[in-house]
Amino acid sequence: VRRDAVDADIARWYEVFPRLAERRSQRAGSLSGGEQQMLAIARALMSKPKLLLCDEPSLGLAPLITQELFEVLKKLNADEGLSILLVEQNANLALKVAHRVYLLETGNVVASGTAAEISSDDSIRKAYLGA
């Protein structure tokens, strides 16, 4: 891989995650939890995958950072055609970005469907979405 291609990719992900550009001189270990999550995703995207696996990306993050991160994931899916497999305990947040949902309880699939179907099911809303 040519260095200028790598530099172009880095610049691209700095545009997607401007917080990382602002902190480019910091060591990764000194970044906040949200910034570290953004860095992990940007590093994964450098290899141009067709599928991005995200395990609890909102865990321990401030609400504003979580919102920002999920907006980026949604945009990557819509604009880049990137498939994203998301495991997330914040069901309401996941439903805002998901196309297809598999609801798990103690390791078993208890419901599946489109995000709209899951969101509109009264029994699921009461049991899992706090409605």
Short names for language-model regions:
Residues M46-K50:
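A short, proline-enriched helix->beta-strand linker immediately N-terminal to the Walker B motif
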Residues R100, S112:
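Short, glycine/charged-rich "phosphate-handling" switch motifs in NTP-dependent
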Residues Q67-G81:
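Helical segment within the ABC ATPase nucleotide-binding domain
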Residues V1-A8, V16-A21, G113, A131:
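ABC-type ATPase nucleotide-binding domains, specifically the catalytic core motifs of the NBD
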Residues L31, A44-L45:
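ABC ATPase signature
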Residues L52-E56:
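Catalytic Walker B motif of ABC-type/P-loop ATPase nucleotide-binding domains
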Residues R27-L31, E35:
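Conserved ABC ATPase signature
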